[in-house]
UniProtKB/Swiss-Prot annotation:
Its main location: membrane. Residues 44-84, 149-213 are extracellular. The lineage of its organism: Eukaryota, Metazoa, Chordata, Craniata, Vertebrata. N-glycosylated. Palmitoylated by ZDHHC17/HIP14. It holds the Pfam family Myelin_PLP. Residues 1-22, 106-127, 235-278 are cytoplasmic. One of its GO terms (biological process) is stem cell differentiation. Glycans are attached at N164, N208. This is Neuronal membrane glycoprotein M6-a. GO terms for molecular function: calcium channel activity. The chain crosses the membrane at residues 23-43, 85-105, 128-148, 214-234. The modification N-acetylmethionine is found at M1. Expressed in hippocampus (at protein level). Isoform 1 is the predominant isoform expressed in brain, specifically in hippocampus. Isoform 2 is expressed at low levels in brain and kidney.
Length: 278
């Protein structure tokens, strides 16, 4: 009988511990973090592969080659974009962890008005700093989304030219890289529908794959923007809750101090009456 009671108490203690742990999870921050990681992964992974596919298309079908020396050509720019992608992946991996940790501390402080993190002035400054930083990152991701739409537009034009070539017989269309600013005005890098390279490019799966990779990268950038907006809502709500918790804590401190003073006054009067009676 005693063993069954002990087992029941143990199970009850484990259940209460699990409920307490689940109650301390910042679900809103968790959803935003998952969305951020998914968006950054799609943008960085698909963007990197799309840039590599662009290099292969330029070298294979447009017969472009890397210039010797330190000249800033399209291939150098693509390499720079790849390094930027590496930095974005690492930076936002760390930033997502920081926001999750901040969410855990904030949730714990809201559950307990006398927590040690968000009730302090330093904790409130950290929350305000995260709000400002997340807002700046949201603006940055909006710029990244707008910039990522440019290659999508370029590849859509190329895909449209290839499609029109197959639909309209005898169409003589040309694709000039100078229209997109990829090469300088003095260079003439264009292919027309009558050339073999153009037909090979349109029939290859590489063009279609690169086009869709850029579309997925654009979707990933949009998901990162949504994650930043979600983070802003979560951080702003946490800031409001923490501010109310601070006010409540000050009120409780003042109330307890007044009660202690009243208790001391009553104790002093009781002692005086007792001394006067004796």
């Amino acid at each position: 009988m005693e063993e069954n009671m002990e087992e029941g108490q143990t199970q009850k203690g484990c259940f209460e511990c699990c409920i307490k742990c689940l109650g301390g999870i910042p679900y809103a921050s968790l959803i935003a973090t998952i969305l951020l990681y998914a968006g950054v992964a799609l943008f960085c992974g698909c963007g990197h592969e799309a840039l590599s596919g662009t290099v292969n298309i330029l070298q294979t079908y447009f017969e472009m080659a890397r210039t010797a020396g330190d000249t800033l050509d399209v291939f150098t720019m693509i390499d720079i974009f790849k390094y930027v992608i590496y930095g974005i992946a690492a930076a936002f991996f760390v930033y997502g962890i920081l926001l999750m940790v901040e969410g855990f501390f904030t949730t714990g402080a809201i559950k307990d008005l006398y927590g040690d993190f968000k009730i302090t002035t330093c904790g409130r400054c950290v929350s305000a700093w995260f709000i400002m930083l997340t807002y700046l990152f949201m603006l940055a991701w909006l710029g990244v989304t707008a910039f990522t739409s440019l290659p999508v537009y370029m590849y859509f034009n190329v895909w449209t030219i290839c499609r029109n070539t197959t639909l309209v017989e005898g169409a003589n269309l040309c694709l000039d890289l100078r229209q997109f600013g990829i090469v300088t005005i003095g260079e003439e890098k264009k292919i027309c529908t009558v050339s073999e390279n153009f037909l090979r490019m349109c029939e290859s799966t590489e063009l279609n794959m690169t086009f869709h990779l850029f579309i997925v990268a654009l979707a990933g950038a949009g998901a990162a923007v949504i994650a930043m907006v979600h983070y802003l809502m979560v951080l702003s709500a946490n800031w409001a809750y923490v501010k109310d918790a601070c006010r409540m804590q000050k009120y409780e401190d003042i109330k307890s101090k007044e009660e202690q003073e009243l208790h001391d006054i009553h104790s002093t009067r009781s002692k005086e009456r007792l001394n006067a009676y004796t």
